């Protein structure tokens, strides 16, 4: 199982938000490319980049840093945040991203995944599903749909999604541990790999995810606040 450090960018800084709220930050650091290199030097085999300006405002202001990290990190990079069109996705893959992460637009219009898979291949497409109280939420967690993650996951798998990034919003950024069940339901019901995110605070949390068969886990606040040592975490889940 992969342990995948998050490098979330806002206003050209590396940040970690509490519950996705741009006004509440655990962490704010300069020079995201240097942070990315630090995680790779500690053993990260993949990086998870999020352009929060893109996600929140639909404006891409961190492209320079994103391209820098793709070029210099030496590991595959998955990127999300503000990818709202096929053109955005193709642009990032051409720049060298390993995977693009598509969120709201895929839930609202799953057909876009079919079109995109024809252009870049399923293996390059990760769809981000975020759930709150058992239902998928979209638009930066502001709007709740009537669908469960498994219902939407099956549709997206059929359309050509290569993997799912699943965030349990109830746990995200609070540093109070995980609820494994919603992720397990996805792993049990879909064939494509599931990457989990949200609420990991201990190596024990990571081992719980490993036990249910996830492909990887994105870690954010816990490594920035030194609750988890990345090197130890990677070693523990090998």
From Swiss-Prot:
Pathway: Amino-acid biosynthesis; L-histidine biosynthesis; L-histidine from 5-phospho-alpha-D-ribose 1-diphosphate: step 4/9. It is found in: Cytoplasm. Its main location: cytoplasm. GO terms for biological process: L-histidine biosynthetic process; L-tryptophan biosynthetic process. InterPro entries: Aldolase_TIM, His_biosynth, HisA_bact_arch, Isoase_HisA-like, Isoase_HisA-like_bact, RibuloseP-bd_barrel. Pfam families: His_biosynth (PF00977). The keyword Lipid metabolism does not apply. It is an enzyme of class 5 (isomerase). It catalyses: 1-(5-phospho-beta-D-ribosyl)-5-[(5-phospho-beta-D-ribosylamino)methylideneamino]imidazole-4-carboxamide = 5-[(5-phospho-1-deoxy-D-ribulos-1-ylimino)methylamino]-1-(5-phospho-beta-D-ribosyl)imidazole-4-carboxamide. Keywords: Amino-acid biosynthesis, Cytoplasm, Histidine biosynthesis, Isomerase. Disulfide bonds: none annotated. It comes from Methanococcus maripaludis (strain C7 / ATCC BAA-1331). GO terms for molecular function: 1-(5-phosphoribosyl)-5-[(5-phosphoribosylamino)methylideneamino]imidazole-4-carboxamide isomerase activity. This is 1-(5-phosphoribosyl)-5-[(5-phosphoribosylamino)methylideneamino] imidazole-4-carboxamide isomerase. Belongs to the HisA/HisF family.
